[in-house]
């Protein structure tokens, strides 16, 4: 069984959706929540779901040996970034080649890169009058939001949609597609 670590900086709704979706699955399960913020609500979600969690700050991530050891101690095979706002260290990408994925709240390459996360993305989408938005699930590479695309799903927008409306449409796509995509990646092909 593949053991997953989910990296989160905030609320953790995608973490919870993935954990619940994989519950009872024989191919993969969420074994660890890693948050860089001690006040992240995701830590409470992990406690409620019975998932072990660890606060691992930017300073902790700067220590390659300790970070790799922490993940090794938990037998982590795969990493999912779900609202994780730190840049993933290069050493981690090299240690987990094609085993780290991210979800981005836009149709990359639009609205990607440094500073483009959460409502920053949705505000830019609204400001530019986009007719659609969506999600991109991709492998993590050394280029911010530049890894190979696994899945893109779009949703139409109306000029009347507010930033909150856009965010809600994107959250619905995340909820529907992110857990299924994680399982699909980790399910052995026949």
Locate the predicted segments by residue.
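One-carbon transfer enzymes
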Residues: 1-190
């Amino acid at each position: 069984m593949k053991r997953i670590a989910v990296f989160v900086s905030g609320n953790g709704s995608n973490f919870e959706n993935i954990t619940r979706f994989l519950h009872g699955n024989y191919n993969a399960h969420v074994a660890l929540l890693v948050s860089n913020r001690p006040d992240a609500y995701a830590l409470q979600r992990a406690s409620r779901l019975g998932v072990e969690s660890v606060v691992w700050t930017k300073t902790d991530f700067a220590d390659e040996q300790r970070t790799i050891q922490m993940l090794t101690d938990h037998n982590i095979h795969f990493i999912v970034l779900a609202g994780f706002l730190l840049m993933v260290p290069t050493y981690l990408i090299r240690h987990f080649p094609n085993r780290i994925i991210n979800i981005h709240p836009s149709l990359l390459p639009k609205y990607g890169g440094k500073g483009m996360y959460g409502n920053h993305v949705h505000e830019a989408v609204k400001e530019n009058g986009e007719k659609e938005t969506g999600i991109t699930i991709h492998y993590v590479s050394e280029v911010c939001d530049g890894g190979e695309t696994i899945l893109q799903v779009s949703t139409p927008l109306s000029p009347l949609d507010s930033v909150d409306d856009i965010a809600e449409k994107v959250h619905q796509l995340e909820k529907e597609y992110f857990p299924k995509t994680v399982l699909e990646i980790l399910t052995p092909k026949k």
